[in-house]
Each structure stands twice: as structure tokens, then as C-alpha cells.
């Protein structure tokens, strides 16, 4: 039995320079796993709570000493001498101890840091990669796939201090035959875009997720420049590269007027009009994936958008579903969206994350494993994408080590799988 000997948590810094939590779980066998937890900027209102200290005299209130203390005391005492292999039971025990609907007592950040570290400790003890152990506890042993990346190359919205309304402009290298080639394609296009921005007199500073963050005239100008970067990199639109956008529509939505405002373009749209605004973009540019194309509370808007675009475009629910199986089940019933973004810290445990992924896959919803805008060097999401056979991953741009660390981990996983000659699929297509 792999008994828990010690749990040790601490404050570290995330990619924005604010505190987050890192936790080690030590087993009596001498093995230990550790993980750190990311933080979002544009967060869904239904997400599990990220516990902050709110002490304005320290880190502007963003400290996580309370979360660290809960892990080092109450959570450790509850898990001490327990079998770390009982992932589901221990995750459920932490949820029960927390005693709230949204993990607001301990904080989802505290609980998740322990949940991931438990699994990593057992993977090390078993001498298997983390993705293999994820596959094992997900009851899909050795059913691996290397995910198609969504590579963020222009940041806007809450992820950058610029005037672009839509939050993320991404490319997907659908013509790649491996993650190594996908990364090469992404890197070449990213750097070519930087050259084009300089030629046009725009800034090449980057945003939270490593994409360029210039002030542009419109959302369409961003798409136009990315198209040019693809062509000048000697790749073909639709054949080698398609586009993906994250609207983060809840940040554009006025709940009083129930209209979406694009400040940079000085335009407003109701729910139906905004769907047709996006539809127009998909006809002009090779956009094959739209995330959060409506406000998180606008289920009817999502239903209409799915009816209009859902047969040809990947419509991703992020704030809509917040990695919560309950909201996903409702969306499936209402035929809202056709894909789900998975963020570990939106729900707060590995067990609940795996349950949501399985529910999505059973109902033929595409799954995209995702980072957050405030990241760490932790590469858990790369293993999660491979181990659950998710098919896609969204982990930022081709710069900033908090983003490239995930791509580098995927390269190593692919190399390992090739060396072991294991049977696995490279899901480098948008739809299964």
C-alpha cells in the first residue's frame, strides 16, 4: 500500500508574477510528486473558487497563504497514512472536508495541487509516465494520442493591454504529421508574424499567453495579418493551417442591454447578430474553431449558434461548461456547443476532470485540454491530453517558457511513444 507520509505546500510565483500554490505529496516508499496550479484572468462565474488571502498589504491581496495552510494542516491530517492510489476516494474526501458547492473553503487551487501531486507520486512509484497513469485511472489504458495544438499568436481582450476585442487568435497546424512538425510550423508562422508586425510599425510585445499584443484597427486585421504570415511562411491555408478564435464573449457582454460590444470597432450586436458576425468571419478566413462565441449565461444564444455553425465549426464551451459535468450534461441536452474546453482548476480535482472528459467523449463532444493565462512550469496538461486521448491542446504561443514547457513535454512524450513502439494515434485532425 502506497501510504502518504507527508504533504508540503508553499507559495510560488506564476507567469504573471503573482502567488500560486505548489504542493508535494511524499509517500512512505520514498517517492513524491509535486504540482503547481495556474490562475485565469477571464474566469467563468461558475468556476470552483480560487482561494486568495485578500490581504491588501501583501501581493495586492493575491497571496495564497490561506490555501497553503489548509494543505499543510487540515488536508494533510485527513490524508495522512491513506493509500495514495485511491485517487477518487481521496479527491472525494477533500471535497467532503471542504463542505461547499464550489470548494470555497479550502479553495480549488489548494485541492487541485494535492490531487495532481497524489497521481504524480504514484506514477513515479510505479515507474511509469504520468500520462500512462492518467490513462490507467481513466480506465483507458494505453489508448494514447498526441494532441493537435491550438497555437496562440495574437492576444487581445483580458490577456493583453491592447485594443483588440477578441481574446485569442490561434492557428492549428492540421497538415502536421507529428507534434515536432506542428511546433516547427507554429514557430515559423509566429516569428513571421513578428516580422510583418514590425514592417507595419506595430508593437511586437507579447501578452499573457505569449502571443503578440499590438493595437490593431479591428479583429479582422488580426486575421488578415495571420493569413499573410501563413502564406509568407510557405504554408497553405485550409490545407496546412486553420484558425481558431476565443471570443471570451462574457467579457464583451453587457448584462443590462444584453448586447455584445466591440469597443475597437465601435459596434454592438445582439445574440443572433453576433453569431452572424462570427459566421461572416468564418466565410472569409479559415476559422474552424470558435470558443465562447456567446455569453456564459446565454444558453439560447449558444443553441442558435450551434444550429447555424455547429455542423462545420468546432464550437467550444469554456465559461459555458467550466469543466463541470453537470453543466456539460445540460449543454448536451440543449444541443449547445459541440466541444468543451478542459481546465483542471475550473473544477479542482483530477477525478472530476476525468469524469467530465469521459462524458464529453461519450457524447461525441470534441475535447480541448487547456492552460490558463497565469501559468507555471507545470506540464500536467500535456500528460492529461495524451493520457485521455483528448485530441487537442491549447497551451499558448511559441515564446515564454510557461507555454513552451508544455510543447517540449509533448515532444518528449511523442519521442518516448515512438521509441516504445506503442500503438497510439496522432489526432492531428479537427474532428474525430
From Swiss-Prot:
SUPFAM superfamilies per record: Enolase C-terminal domain-like (SSF51604), Enolase N-terminal domain-like (SSF54826)
Known EC number: 4.2.1.11
Residues annotated to bind Mg(2+): 246, 291, 318
Highest taxon of the lineage: Bacteria
Subcellular location(s) per record: Cytoplasm; Secreted; Cell surface
InterPro entries: Enolase, Enolase-like_C_sf, Enolase-like_N, Enolase_C, Enolase_CS, Enolase_N
One Gene Ontology term of the molecular function aspect: phosphopyruvate hydratase activity
GO CC aspect terms: cell surface; extracellular region; phosphopyruvate hydratase complex
Active site location: 209, 343
Catalytic class of the enzyme: lyase
Cofactor note: Binds a second Mg(2+) ion via substrate during catalysis.
Catalyses which reaction(s): (2R)-2-phosphoglycerate = phosphoenolpyruvate + H2O
Residue numbers binding (2R)-2-phosphoglycerate: 167, 343, 372-373, 394
Pathway linked to the protein: Carbohydrate degradation; glycolysis; pyruvate from D-glyceraldehyde 3-phosphate: step 4/5
Main localization, broad class: cytoplasm
UniProt keyword terms in alphabetical order: Cytoplasm, Glycolysis, Lyase, Magnesium, Metal-binding, Secreted
Cofactor(s) needed for function: Mg(2+)
Record function comment: Catalyzes the reversible conversion of 2-phosphoglycerate (2-PG) into phosphoenolpyruvate (PEP). It is essential for the degradation of carbohydrates via glycolysis.
Entry similarity comment: Belongs to the enolase family.
Name listed for the protein in its UniProt record: Enolase
Source species taxonomy: Bacteria, Pseudomonadati, Pseudomonadota, Gammaproteobacteria, Enterobacterales
Gene from which the chain derives: eno
Amino acid at each position: 500500500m502506497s501510504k502518504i507520509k507527508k504533504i508540503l505546500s508553499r507559495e510560488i510565483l506564476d507567469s504573471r508574477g503573482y502567488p500560486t500554490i505548489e504542493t508535494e505529496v511524499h509517500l512512505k516508499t520514498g517517492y513524491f510528486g509535486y504540482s503547481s496550479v495556474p490562475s485565469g484572468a477571464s474566469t467563468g462565474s461558475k468556476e470552483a473558487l480560487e482561494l486568495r488571502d485578500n490581504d491588501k498589504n501583501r501581493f495586492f491581496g493575491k497571496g495564497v497563504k490561506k490555501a497553503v495552510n489548509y494543505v499543510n494542516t487540515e488536508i494533510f491530517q485527513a490524508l495522512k497514512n491513506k493509500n495514495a492510489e485511491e485517487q477518487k476516494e481521496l479527491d472525494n474526501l477533500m471535497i467532503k472536508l471542504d463542505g461547499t458547492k464550489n470548494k470555497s473553503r479550502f479553495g480549488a487551487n489548494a485541492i487541485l495541487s494535492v490531487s495532481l501531486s497524489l497521481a504524480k507520486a504514484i506514477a513515479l512509484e510505479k515507474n511509469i509516465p504520468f500520462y500512462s497513469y492518467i490513462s490507467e485511472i481513466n480506465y483507458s489504458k494505453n489508448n494514447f494520442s498526441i494532441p493537435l495544438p491550438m497555437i496562440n499568436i495574437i492576444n487581445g481582450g483580458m490577456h493583453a493591454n491592447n485594443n483588440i476585442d477578441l481574446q485569442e487568435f490561434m492557428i492549428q497546424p492540421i497538415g502536421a504529421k507529428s507534434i515536432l512538425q506542428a511546433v516547427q510550423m507554429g514557430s515559423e508562422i509566429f516569428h513571421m508574424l513578428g516580422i510583418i508586425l514590425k514592417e507595419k510599425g506595430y508593437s511586437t510585445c507579447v501578452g499573457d499567453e505569449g502571443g503578440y499584443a499590438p493595437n490593431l484597427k479591428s479583429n479582422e486585421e488580426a486575421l488578415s495579418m495571420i493569413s499573410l504570415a501563413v502564406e509568407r511562411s510557405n504554408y497553405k491555408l485550409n490545407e496546412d493551417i486553420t484558425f481558431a478564435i476565443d471570443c471570451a464573449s462574457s467579457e464583451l457582454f453587457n448584462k443590462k442591454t444584453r448586447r455584445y460590444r466591440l469597443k475597437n470597432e465601435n459596434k454592438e450586436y445582439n445574440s443572433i447578430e453576433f453569431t452572424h458576425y462570427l459566421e461572416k468571419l468564418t466565410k472569409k478566413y479559415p476559422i474552424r474553431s470558435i470558443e465562447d462565441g456567446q455569453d456564459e449565461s446565454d444558453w439560447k444564444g449558444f443553441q442558435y449558434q450551434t444550429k447555424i455553425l455547429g455542423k462545420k465549426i468546432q464550437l467550444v464551451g469554456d465559461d459555458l461548461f467550466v469543466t463541470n459535468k453537470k453543466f456539460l450534461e445540460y449543454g448536451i441536452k440543449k444541443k449547445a456547443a459541440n466541444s468543451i474546453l478542459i481546465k483542471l482548476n475550473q473544477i479542482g480535482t483530477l477525478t472530476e476532470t476525468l469524469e467530465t472528459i469521459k462524458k464529453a467523449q461519450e457524447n461525441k463532444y470534441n475535447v480541448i485540454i487547456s492552460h490558463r493565462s497565469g501559468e507555471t512550469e507545470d506540464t500536467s496538461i500535456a500528460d492529461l491530453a495524451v493520457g485521455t486521448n483528448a485530441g487537442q491542446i491549447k497551451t499558448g504561443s511559441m515564446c515564454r517558457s510557461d507555454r513552451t514547457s508544455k510543447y517540449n513535454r509533448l515532444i518528449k512524450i511523442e519521442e518516448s511513444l515512438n521509441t516504445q513502439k506503442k500503438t497510439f494515434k496522432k489526432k492531428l485532425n479537427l474532428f474525430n
